[in-house]
């Protein structure tokens, strides 16, 4: 199948969702050679991925993943693609604790850094969390605390079959896009940041095919793969099976804008301090961007009607100490179990 897929893509023909799923199944079962995987990655990147192809690949990766069971009917993830190369602190991971502090179930999917100094896993490790906690501990944490961290390598073992080809080719490919679409807990409400504006609709349509309930796929005009407080943000919102795209203006939501340097992060130690400061109630642009991204997640989860009430709820999660309590509880639980 992969040979047929390569030939079709080289001719600039798109694969159907079913065809892509079959190709990825071959790759993730170890049946494709490194040369075939490399050729496939390069050809697809040159042609450009479609949302059907993205959904087909994600569907296979979900099927191959180790799964955890979460009883909540609403499960939020704030995992994005990464790769914006903006050097910010870990906004979406910090926002996840704010969301959990509002009583919404969060299954945060993530990994170590690929292109930045500090990925979500690097941050949480610096905050004291045990990354290699068994799946059952993560499952229990989500059930008891309301938040857990799903460290991607522990759940997506089938990706090892593409690892060597990805390393040897060394360019961004469809594999870099799949993380936010393959949450092992089956998250159905998402805020998903992407590294390029043309990806917002593509990811939103892929989430629609994959059965997501509601999602905000976002890219700031300043290049941020989050909802930005420095510039308008392009949003493709999935709701009720329909996708609409529009711009969010931070000054209309918060009454102010920030400068990009205000959101700068650093290594895991630096970012851990920033996260603790924000969750501890520090005021400023870092708090603003976390609150805005958490607010979108609360709307996606149905925990708020619109941004004004969602922003208030997010601020109360921080100021009432609930957000940092969730962080401390998760760190403690992963180390004691």
UniProtKB/Swiss-Prot annotation:
<dbReference type="InterPro" id="IPR017459">
    <property type="entry name" value="Glycosyl_Trfase_fam3_N_dom"/>
</dbReference>
<feature type="binding site">
    <location>
        <position position="80"/>
    </location>
    <ligand>
        <name>anthranilate 1</name>
    </ligand>
</feature>
<comment type="function">
    <text>Catalyzes the transfer of the phosphoribosyl group of 5-phosphorylribose-1-pyrophosphate (PRPP) to anthranilate to yield N-(5'-phosphoribosyl)-anthranilate (PRA).</text>
</comment>
<feature type="binding site">
    <location>
        <position position="88"/>
    </location>
    <ligand>
        <name>5-phospho-alpha-D-ribose 1-diphosphate</name>
    </ligand>
</feature>
<comment type="pathway">
    <text>Amino-acid biosynthesis; L-tryptophan biosynthesis; L-tryptophan from chorismate: step 2/5.</text>
</comment>
<feature type="binding site">
    <location>
        <position position="80"/>
    </location>
    <ligand>
        <name>5-phospho-alpha-D-ribose 1-diphosphate</name>
    </ligand>
</feature>
<feature type="binding site">
    <location>
        <position position="166"/>
    </location>
    <ligand>
        <name>anthranilate 2</name>
    </ligand>
</feature>
<feature type="binding site">
    <location>
        <begin position="83"/>
        <end position="84"/>
    </location>
    <ligand>
        <name>5-phospho-alpha-D-ribose 1-diphosphate</name>
    </ligand>
</feature>
<keyword id="KW-0028">Amino-acid biosynthesis</keyword>
<feature type="binding site">
    <location>
        <begin position="108"/>
        <end position="116"/>
    </location>
    <ligand>
        <name>5-phospho-alpha-D-ribose 1-diphosphate</name>
    </ligand>
</feature>
<feature type="binding site">
    <location>
        <position position="111"/>
    </location>
    <ligand>
        <name>anthranilate 1</name>
    </ligand>
</feature>
<feature type="binding site">
    <location>
        <position position="120"/>
    </location>
    <ligand>
        <name>5-phospho-alpha-D-ribose 1-diphosphate</name>
    </ligand>
</feature>
<dbReference type="GO" id="GO:0005829">
    <property type="term" value="C:cytosol"/>
</dbReference>
<comment type="subunit">
    <text>Homodimer.</text>
</comment>
<dbReference type="Pfam" id="PF02885">
    <property type="entry name" value="Glycos_trans_3N"/>
</dbReference>
<keyword id="KW-0057">Aromatic amino acid biosynthesis</keyword>
<protein>
    <recommendedName>
        <fullName>Anthranilate phosphoribosyltransferase</fullName>
        <ecNumber>2.4.2.18</ecNumber>
    </recommendedName>
</protein>
<keyword id="KW-0328">Glycosyltransferase</keyword>
<dbReference type="InterPro" id="IPR005940">
    <property type="entry name" value="Anthranilate_Pribosyl_Tfrase"/>
</dbReference>
<comment type="similarity">
    <text>Belongs to the anthranilate phosphoribosyltransferase family.</text>
</comment>
<feature type="binding site">
    <location>
        <position position="225"/>
    </location>
    <ligand>
        <name>Mg(2+) 2</name>
    </ligand>
</feature>
<feature type="binding site">
    <location>
        <position position="226"/>
    </location>
    <ligand>
        <name>Mg(2+) 1</name>
    </ligand>
</feature>
<feature type="binding site">
    <location>
        <position position="92"/>
    </location>
    <ligand>
        <name>Mg(2+) 1</name>
    </ligand>
</feature>
<dbReference type="GO" id="GO:0004048">
    <property type="term" value="F:anthranilate phosphoribosyltransferase activity"/>
</dbReference>
<dbReference type="Pfam" id="PF00591">
    <property type="entry name" value="Glycos_transf_3"/>
</dbReference>
<dbReference type="GO" id="GO:0000162">
    <property type="term" value="P:L-tryptophan biosynthetic process"/>
</dbReference>
<dbReference type="GO" id="GO:0000287">
    <property type="term" value="F:magnesium ion binding"/>
</dbReference>
<feature type="binding site">
    <location>
        <position position="226"/>
    </location>
    <ligand>
        <name>Mg(2+) 2</name>
    </ligand>
</feature>
<keyword id="KW-0808">Transferase</keyword>
<keyword id="KW-0822">Tryptophan biosynthesis</keyword>
<dbReference type="InterPro" id="IPR035902">
    <property type="entry name" value="Nuc_phospho_transferase"/>
</dbReference>
<dbReference type="InterPro" id="IPR036320">
    <property type="entry name" value="Glycosyl_Trfase_fam3_N_dom_sf"/>
</dbReference>
<feature type="binding site">
    <location>
        <begin position="90"/>
        <end position="93"/>
    </location>
    <ligand>
        <name>5-phospho-alpha-D-ribose 1-diphosphate</name>
    </ligand>
</feature>
<keyword id="KW-0460">Magnesium</keyword>
<keyword id="KW-0479">Metal-binding</keyword>
<dbReference type="InterPro" id="IPR000312">
    <property type="entry name" value="Glycosyl_Trfase_fam3"/>
</dbReference>
């Amino acid at each position: 199948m992969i040979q047929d897929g390569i030939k079709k893509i080289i001719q600039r023909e798109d694969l159907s969702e079913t065809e892509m799923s079959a190709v990825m199944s071959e790759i993730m079962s170890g049946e494709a050679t490194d040369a075939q995987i490399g050729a496939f990655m390069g050809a697809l990147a040159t042609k450009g991925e479609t949302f059907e192809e993205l959904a087909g690949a994600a569907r296979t990766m979900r099927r191959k993943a180790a799964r955890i069971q979460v009883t909540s009917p609403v499960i939020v993830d704030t995992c994005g693609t990464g790769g914006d190369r903006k050097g910010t602190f870990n906004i979406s991971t910090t926002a996840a604790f704010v969301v959990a502090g509002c009583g919404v179930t969060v299954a945060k999917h993530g990994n170590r850094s690929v292109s930045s100094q500090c990925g979500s896993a690097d941050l949480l490790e610096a905050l004291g969390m045990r990354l290699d906690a068994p799946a059952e501990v993560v499952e229990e944490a989500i059930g008891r605390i309301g938040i857990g961290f799903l460290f991607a390598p522990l759940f997506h073992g089938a990706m090892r079959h593409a690892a060597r080809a990805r390393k040897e080719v060394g360019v961004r490919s469809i594999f870099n896009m799949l993380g936010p679409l393959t949450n092992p807990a089956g998250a159905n409400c998402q805020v998903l940041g992407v590294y390029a504006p043309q990806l917002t609709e593509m990811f939103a349509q892929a989430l629609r095919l994959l059965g997501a309930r509601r999602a905000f796929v976002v890219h700031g005009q300043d290049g941020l793969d989050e909802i930005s407080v420095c510039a308008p943000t392009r949003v493709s919102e999935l709701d009720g099976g329909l996708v609409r795209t529009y711009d969010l203006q931070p000054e209309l939501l918060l009454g102010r804008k920030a400068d990009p340097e205000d959101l700068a992060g650093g290594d895991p130690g630096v970012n851990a301090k920033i996260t603790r400061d924000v969750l501890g109630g520090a005021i400023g642009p870092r708090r603003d961007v976390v609150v805005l991204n958490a607010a979108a997640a609360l709307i996606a989860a149905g925990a708020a009607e619109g941004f004004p009430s969602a922003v208030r709820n997010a601020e109360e999660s921080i100021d009432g100490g609930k957000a940092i309590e969730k962080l401390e509880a998760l760190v403690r639980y992963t180390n004691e179990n």
